[in-house]
Amino acid sequence: MAFNFNWSPLTADAEFYQRAQEMLTAALNKSPKPPIIKDDILVNELNLGSVPPDLEILEIGDLAEDRFRGIFKMCYSGDAFLTLKTRVQANPLNNHLFSKPSFTSPQPLAADAGLTIPLQITLSDIKLSAFIIVVFSKSKGLTLVFRNDPLESLKVSSTFDSIPFIKDYLQKEIEQQLRTLMMDELPAIIHRLSLRLWCPEYRAKEDQEMAEAAKKTKDEVAVDPFASPPQDAVDARGNVLDATEISNLSLDGGSEIHSLFSQKNLLRLAALTNSHRTLSLFTPSIRDAVFRAWAPSERGDSAGTTTPATPSLQRPQSSLGSQSTTYTFSNRSSDDGHGGIPSRPSLVNMNSATTGLSLGANRGSRSHPTRKKKNRVVNLRKPKTTESSESGESETASTTAVSEPTVPSRIPEEPEDLPVTPPSGKVRFNSIDLGDSPKKLPPSRSMTPEQVKMDQIPSLTVQPSTPINTQEQKRPAYNQSASTSYTPEKSAITPPHTPFSYPHGLHFSTTESPSGILEQAWIMKMASELARRQHDDKTARQGFWSTSSNGDDAPPAYEPKAL
């Protein structure tokens, strides 16, 4: 069985080509276009060529005088060609800016605006191979369905063939768009064309619809842009127009109609044009804003160095009788009348700060960071020839000689039955030896930091009724054999002691006379006695729990009762 297809009427009918071009144009602009194409795609020329496709009959399902249904294998490699026109983006960066987040792209103005140029594309050497299902009826036209992708290859020629990158990009994009067009849009186009060719009723109906659309377009009232003119309209010379002059204008008026724009918009358009021409970022000014570059320099350029001043630390303490007293130890200045602040914190300052005592410098004295400090140490212990005691005494005195105190702020506390005497040999403290010292260090009892915080100094007035020398003579002398000396191992580690809070009004000063040293020794003795009485009163008030914590007799252990 053979079939004869007449291909010449399709190639010779001009009306058919015109209608086919309109349908192809609508189909190409219907689908989403790539971002590089900035205008509509127009089918400029369509030619089916003189070579018809080759059809191989695989199956015939229905055959009658006015209908036909069958499956064919189609192969086409003719001389048909198609020419398209559009406008594309000349900036190659624009394609990448749309596919990436905005914060990752610099978005330069010259590249983001871009330049659109015309593009002409010619599709030729089209090769098709597919299995198609053909259903023909005079009343319903021709229906053609592709069972697979028909496009094998085609040749794409454009105005950018000299640039390999653009040529390859256009080849890939057009092939992808053409495959979608043949699978989805081409069967519908062929069906409508067949209805127009074989069905006169459909042709008359389609002509009537086209005439109505043209009439509607012709009768459409144009929108007058001057119905609501801008508020600050100006003419070509920049003169502001009033309402009467604007009302006299019309769409077909004088030659100055094109210049009737808002003055603000003209300034913005001019700034935008300048930014494209000069690559200016055109940063607008911000009202009521202070930029950092405008602010004066806040760096203080001072000549010389500033001595760091240590603030005086003071801590008020109140007794049980709701009495508030502040105790302050202050350093005395040197012989030249100018005090000095140590450049770094000493061990005594650290210990005093943690226990609440205040070691501040002279308020009102000047600071001399380059002057060497003079340290003075008061030796209050009895001379002794034992070298072990010398090592223990030097450990205590060296910590006191750092911050230039007149009286050691930390008094070592010892049991009453173990008096300690200082060495009789020469001990070098980098200070002035102030003569003889008292025979015995006043006894004191150790106190915990918690007891110092809770207990306050009671209001006790001590007045010496006899001279200090008489009291010193009445003291019993201890035997040298009864004294206990420290070993070098014990003297290397200073046990933690709590400094005493001396009564209000006591002031220590360094003098070179023996009477001043004895007076200081008597004051220290009285302070130790006050601390001992305070500790005894505290121990008596605490009761059972304090006794058990101090190591007294513990309650008897549990013993089961004998049956």
UniProtKB/Swiss-Prot annotation:
Keyword Oxidoreductase attached: no
GO cellular component: ERMES complex
InterPro entries: Mdm34 (IPR027536), SMP_LBD (IPR031468)
Bias (Basic residues) ranges: 365-383
Keywords: Lipid transport, Lipid-binding, Membrane, Mitochondrion, Mitochondrion outer membrane, Transmembrane, Transmembrane beta strand, Transport
Membrane topology recorded in Swiss-Prot or TrEMBL: Multi-pass membrane protein
Composition bias, Low complexity: 386-407
Superkingdom of source: Eukaryota
Subcellular location: Mitochondrion outer membrane
Biased composition (Basic and acidic residues): 531-540
Subunit: Component of the ER-mitochondria encounter structure (ERMES) or MDM complex, composed of MMM1, MDM10, MDM12 and MDM34.
Name the UniProt record assigns to this protein: Mitochondrial distribution and morphology protein 34
Gene assigned in the entry: MDM34
